[in-house]
Amino acid sequence: MYLGVVVNPLARKNRGAPLDRSADLRRIVGTWGEVHETGSVDDLGAVVGRLYPRASHLVSDGGDGALNWLINEMHSRVADPLRWPTFVPTNGGTIGFVARKARVRGRAPAILRALTAAAEADRPPTEVWLDTLELKGETTDGATFHRIGFALAAGGVGNRFFDKYYENDDPGRATIARVIARAIGDYAAFGVIPGSNRPNYAAHLFTPTRARVVIDGEEVPTRTHRALHAGAFDVNLGGFLRLFPRASEPGALHFQAGDVSPGGIIAHLPALVAGRAIRGDRLRDINGDEMIIEVDDEPLSPIIDGERFDGIVRLVVHAGPRIRIAQVGSSTAA
């Protein structure tokens, strides 16, 4: 085992860490790995180039999008996912759904102590294979768009939720509850008035995305989408919302596309908390192999694993490569 630790000191939950955080992590890892800092995603290429192929495990210590960027940098360098290192999220983001799914416990120092002990004992931690989404498309300037990810909020409520979520300086589980509570209160007080110029929290959140959507060759019978999402596995968002229950079994993708009224969305909140599928006459909430999204007017700004990408006019979503995640549990990350 050899550990490659990639630290983003600018991530929200790392900003308050001691100035010598990376030095502390290097002391934990010792001779069993390397710790590198990135000032931006532009630094990832050089860092991964130094770590691969020596590193058997790539540890992502950053914010919500850090693991996604690390996986995609590896994907851009090595086509065969079987040759990729094992990835390790460190619960450094605000939503942490990949770590929850893989049952990774603890923060970066505890996780690195467990991994270093495993390396010293020559007993690598157990691993779990997670499904991914592969997203291919086109931008407004005609460029090719290509990403690997686990969860997609291409438009509608799921996408606009993150606008409100990231307005908070320190978002987390409580922020999710506050966004939902304010949207419900605003909708109850004022409703959603089409074309109104009055600022309205609920109106922004419930504004639909206009697009032509085709799932497995069948067009969704509406161009108005308040739900436009995809998941490679069931997601526990901040320990509060349980999304994409139809993707709970390996190999099953969960697609959501279509329209649900704001009142219908609010009525379905208990189902989202409990991890149940949602229903609607103009909604497709199903398993599938491929979803194609073509915008009608405004480009998409999809959220992929908590990271926003602007200016997408066409997006094709299907199964991506399976990825190995090391399971560092509470019994070892202490």
Which residues does each predicted region cover?
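ATP/nucleoside-binding phosphotransfer catalytic cores, i.e., glycine-rich phosphate-binding loops
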Residues: 5, 215-222, 232, 238-334
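Flexible, charged surface loops at secondary-structure boundaries
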Residues: 50-54, 143-145, 220-223, 285-287
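Catalytic core of DAGKc-family lipid kinases
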Residues: 38, 81-224
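ATP/NTP phosphate-donor binding region
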Residues: 1-61, 65-68, 72-77, 82, ...
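Short N-terminal binding/cap micro-motifs at the start of the first secondary-structure element
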Residues: 12-16, 160, 236-239
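Short glycine-/acidic-enriched loop or helix-start segments at secondary-structure transitions
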Residues: 16, 69-71, 98-100, 239-240
